[in-house]
Amino acid sequence: MIVTTKIQDMQTMMQQYRLEGKTIGFVPTMGYLHEGHIALLKKAREENDIVALSVFVNPLQFGPNEDFARYPRDIERDERIAKENGVDVFFCPSVEEMYPHPLSVQVTVKERVDVLCGKSRPGHFDGVATVLTKLFHIVMPTRAYFGMKDAQQVAVVDGLIRDFHFPIELVAVPTVREEDGLAKSSRNVYLSPEERKEAPALYQALQQAKTAIENGERNPETICALVKNYIQTHTHAEIDYVEVYSYPDLKPLEKLHGKVIIAVAVRFASARLIDNITLDIV
């Protein structure tokens, strides 16, 4: 596995692979890799000649009161996990390398951001889209891999690739879960033992919603109420949102039909957790 911190080296390497006719699978991350990331790496390994992984905690996507300084980092561990999972190139630039001077141009996301997490994190997805635009230009991959745990991010990346004509195939990989259903996340380490016991209620609530829809329920408000009620009954968490939209364009629906997302976010004392499911409804 080649490890590099320099943009120039990364570009040269990737260019060489492309000249050799090799396909490149790219997994952009903020590090502190867990099974969710490993699922992305495995999928990339199956589908490409070369797997490139980036680890970069992007300051642009953290709000003023968010956990940039506290976000877990362990680059040696990340390197080990990457190597064990067949990564060919490990790219871990510094903030100075990625942002050597203040940006004169930045990407602003116009659609798909005024709902879900985007609502309470203004500017967050502009930061995501800006760093991905940079990374896509540096790596120029054949395919880019993202987890459906952050389904709004997947929707934003879908729009970014489409609108900027990146010749990149977006591969969305299903959420990886603990045995009790809790979505794997770098932030789960913040949960107290009591909160960890309650946290699977998010996925259980979503499963209740799925069952109701399978039994014919088509009213989004009824579905949201059902999910909220389940979470309030089974946890001490404060609900940030429970929302239902069309997917991936994230538009409100009067009646459930087509591809939809049911998404939740809650705040425990020590961590904010998100989860979602997508369903195809006829």
Curated annotation (Swiss-Prot):
Query: What InterPro entries does the annotation carry?
Result: Cyt_trans-like, Pantoate_ligase, Pantoate_ligase_C, Rossmann-like_a/b/a_fold
Residues spanning the membrane:
none
The biological process GO terms on file are: pantothenate biosynthetic process
Q: What is this protein called?
A: Pantothenate synthetase
Q: What is its main location?
A: cytoplasm
Tell me the superkingdom of the source: Bacteria
Any idea which GO molecular function terms this record carries?
ATP binding; pantoate-beta-alanine ligase activity
Q: Which NCBIfam families match?
A: cyt_tran_rel, panC
Per UniProt, beta-alanine binds at: Q61
- Binding-site residues, (R)-pantoate: Q61, Q153
Q: One Pfam family, short name please?
A: Pantoate_ligase
Q: Which GO terms describe its cellular component?
A: cytosol
- The residues forming a coiled coil are none
Q: Does the keyword Isomerase apply?
A: no
Q: In which pathway does it act?
A: Cofactor biosynthesis; (R)-pantothenate biosynthesis; (R)-pantothenate from (R)-pantoate and beta-alanine: step 1/1
- Write down the species: Geobacillus sp. (strain WCH70)
What family does this belong to?
A: Belongs to the pantothenate synthetase family.
Task: Name the keywords, alphabetized.
Answer: ATP-binding, Cytoplasm, Ligase, Nucleotide-binding, Pantothenate biosynthesis
Which gene is the coding source of this polypeptide chain?
panC
Q: What else is known?
A: The reaction proceeds by a bi uni uni bi ping pong mechanism.
Catalytic reaction(s) noted: (R)-pantoate + beta-alanine + ATP = (R)-pantothenate + AMP + diphosphate + H(+)
